[in-house]
């Protein structure tokens, strides 16, 4: 997104890549890769992509956007060496995000929520509104999976008020996910930050089955305790790197 693009402009390794391929100051960019059997098929896919973009943007507008050059927002990169530059920047997305020079950093706790694809746009807008409600913004980065766009809200984990915001954002985000029949951990597993919410997301019946299965397979709670079942609060401060009242 625009946050990552702006940060990449300040990093010598990626500055030239942004300047060479990013037109203007877009709110976000999407890298689309085609790997068909022939080059002509790849070019045909690119043509289709341009037509799709024009169709999406032109909804409700009378002017011919294709003639106005709106399809030029699709930047075609053919040489493999140039494609590698884009790929390296994409793979470094998280590192670029974490280079943010502030106490507040992108924090992972709702980063891989997934919803059915037809609801992805509405979910994304809803999640953005939740971030705004709590005075922050989300940093969108990494690959776009099926029904999953990776995002981390920017919070200061040394601040008790931002820790409280983290819980509030999680509760509202997971409720939004549930409304769309999605998953609160689409890729990365439940872990400490999400296991607490499993009873809400899966329902008491299924969560009780999780507990019974855990007791059968791991009666002494030896393997990975506190995950999936019997989980601590996601904002329990004894789990944090920075305790309440932390000062430099």
Regions found by a protein language model. Give the residues of each.
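Noncatalytic alpha-helical scaffold of FAD-dependent oxidoreductases
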Residues: 1-143, 147-186, 190-248
């Amino acid at each position: 997104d625009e946050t990552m693009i702006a940060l990449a402009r300040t990093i010598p390794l990626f500055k030239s890549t942004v300047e060479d391929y990013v037109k203007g100051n877009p709110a976000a960019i999407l890298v689309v890769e085609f790997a068909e059997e022939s080059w002509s098929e790849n070019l045909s896919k690119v043509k289709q992509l341009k037509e799709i973009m024009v169709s999406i943007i032109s909804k409700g507008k009378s002017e011919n956007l294709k003639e106005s050059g709106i399809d030029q927002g699709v930047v075609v990169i053919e040489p493999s060496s140039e494609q590698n530059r884009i790929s390296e920047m994409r793979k470094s997305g998280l590192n670029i995000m974490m280079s943010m020079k502030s106490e507040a950093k992108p924090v992972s706790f709702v980063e891989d929520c997934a919803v059915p694809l037809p609801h992805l746009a509405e979910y994304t807008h809803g999640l953005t509104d939740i971030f705004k409600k709590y005075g922050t913004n989300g940093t969108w980065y990494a690959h776009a999976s099926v029904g999953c766009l990776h995002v981390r809200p920017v919070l200061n984990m040394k601040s008790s008020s931002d820790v409280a915001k983290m819980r509030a954002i999680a509760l509202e985000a997971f409720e939004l996910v549930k409304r769309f029949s999605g998953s609160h951990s689409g890729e990365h597993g439940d872990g400490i930050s999400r296991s607490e919410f499993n009873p809400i997301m899966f329902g008491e019946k299924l969560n009780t089955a999780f507990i019974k299965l855990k007791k059968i397979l791991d009666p002494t709670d030896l393997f990975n305790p506190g995950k999936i079942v019997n989980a601590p609060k996601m904002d329990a401060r004894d789990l944090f790197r920075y305790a309440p009242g932390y000062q430099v």
